[in-house]
């Protein structure tokens, strides 16, 4: 049953509906039903078949570069000009502009097969992708650097897992900073995903 169809007593029957109920007793019962351990964010959670960890357990989070003062053009002038990536609900539309790689520090430019997350935009937050070439992320994109060696297939798996957490966020509750870092994801790639031909899922 969804919220719009939830049945509640009408105003005239409200008094009879709550008659005999104790607020203190109800609060006590609610507290007793809580599992405090489950409410605490854990670094690692172990389920029946899968072990989970926070995003920051597996990745180092790197914020993108603000567009202020950056020289951007709408086309690739030559090989020195690389995509400046913005949030998007599709990877094909995530190129905001092209920027000259010589204007950035080496650690501000990320290589092909880098995992990144959109952290802003009502229709684009939380969507995650693996880059198809060198790029510079804008300030509404977070780059994820694996803390262990990962294959391309593993990065695509984690991009899918992160995107599946989209329902937890909104334009008013953006997946930035600690909120993004605390997303729970599997520690290892599932066997089902491992059996997929990676070339069938690359956009």
Residue ranges and their predicted role:
Residues 89, 121, 148, 187-189:
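Short, flexible loop/turn elements at secondary-structure junctions
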Residues 72-74, 106, 174:
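Beta-strand elements of modular eukaryotic interaction domains
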Residues 2-3, 135-142, 172-197, 201:
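A short glycine-rich beta-alpha junction/loop motif
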Residues 167:
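Extended, Lys/Arg-rich, non-catalytic nucleic-acid recognition/anchoring regions
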Residues 80-83, 113, 140, 181:
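Structural beta-strand/beta-sheet cores of well-ordered domains, especially the beta-sheet scaffolds
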Residues 1-93, 190-203:
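Non-catalytic DNA-recognition/assembly elements of restriction-modification systems
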Residues 97-161:
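A short beta-sheet element
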